[in-house]
UniProtKB/Swiss-Prot annotation:
GO terms for biological process: cell wall organization; pectin catabolic process. The keyword Translocase does not apply. Residues 1-19 form the signal peptide. Its EC number is 3.2.1.15. Glycans are attached at residue 246. It is found in: Secreted. Disulfide bonds join 35-50, 209-225, 335-340, 359-368. This is Endopolygalacturonase A. GO terms for molecular function: polygalacturonase activity. PbH1 repeats lie at residues 162-192, 193-214, 215-235, 244-265, 273-295, 307-352. It comes from Aspergillus awamori (Black koji mold). The keyword Hydrolase applies.
Amino acid sequence: MPSAKPLFCLATLAGAALAAPAPSRATDFNKRSTCTFTDAATASESKTSCSDIVLKDITVPAGETLNLKDLNDGTTVTFEGTTTWEYEEWDGPLLRISGKDITVTQSSDAVLNGNGAKWWDGEGTNGGKTKPKFFYAHDLDDSKISGLYIKNTPVQAISVESDNLVIEDVTIDNSDGDSEGGHNTDGFDISESTYITITGATVKNQGDCVAINSGENIYFSGGTCSGGHGLSIGSVGGRDDNTVKNVTFIDSTVSDSENGVRIKTVYDATGTVEDITYSNIQLSGISDYGIVIEQDYENGDPTGTPSNGVTISDVTLEDITGSVDSDAVEIYILCGDGSCTDWTMSGIDITGGETSSDCENVPSGASCSQ
C-alpha cells in the first residue's frame, strides 16, 4: 500500500487549498479507475469502487451469483479469460448485472462457461435436477451487452427485464446439449421490457432462440438460430403483464429446429399480441412447423382447443422461405373465434412438408396453404 499515503496526502492538500471541491474530485478519480477482480466475492463487494470492472478467470462458487447488481451509472464490465460456475442444484441466477448506462463486453478470447452438462438430464425446467438460470439482465437500462460468448447454460441463458437495452453480436452455444441432455436452454427470454434491440445473435440450443412473453418495441435482426424451438412470442397470458406489442423479427435464419416462426397464447387467459412482423426469415431442417400460431396452450402444452381471450392483431408475415421435414406442417393457424384480426401474409414459400387440414378461424389475409 505504499501509494495510498501519497494519494491521501494529495487529496488532503487539495482539500486545504480548495475546500469542499477536493473530496468530490477524489471520488471522481476513484470512479474513473479500473478494477481487476479474480474472485466473485470481491467483485460483488467492491463493484461500486470503480467505473471499469475487469473480471478475469473467475470461478464462481457453487450456489452463488456473480452479483453485479446496482452498478454505478456508466460502468463498463469486461470479462477476460474463462468465467466458470461450480455445480449445485438451485434456481440461480448464475450472473446478475443491473444499472444504468452500463456496457457489458469481453476480451476476444473470453468464455462464460455455465458448465451446463453437470445439470443436464433431458428434463430442463420440467423436472429432474433443479437448474439455475444463467444471466439476469434485469433493470439493465439504457445499456449495452456486446460480443459475449456464452457456453453450456444449465437452462435459459439470458433473461431480459429492462428498458432501452441493446444486445449485439452475442453467441450462446449450447450445442453440446444436443447429445448430452440439454433442454429448455432458451437463448433470450424477454418479459416486461421496452425498447430491446438484439442484433447479430448466434444461438445454438434446445429451447426457444427468442421467447417474448411480454414487452413492447422489441427488434431482433440478423440472428442465426439452430437446434431449438425457433423465433417465438409467448406463451402470452396468465402473467402479471400480458401485452406484447410492436415486435419485429427480420433478416434471420432458423435451422434444424422444431419450429421456424411461432406465436402461442394461453387457453382461457386474457392479453394482447399486437403489431407483430416476421420478415425475411429463412428456414431449413424444421421438424414440426414452419409457421405456427395457436391459442390453445394450457400447462405449457397445446390442447387443440383455442380460446379468444388473448387477441392477436396487426400481424405481418412476409418473405418467410425455406424447407421443413417431410412429416412437418408448413403452416398451422389455430385461432379463437374472432380473436385473430388484421393479418397479412406475402412472399411465403415453405416447402417439403404437409399442408394442415386442422386450421381454425384463420383471419382474412392469412392462409394455411400457399
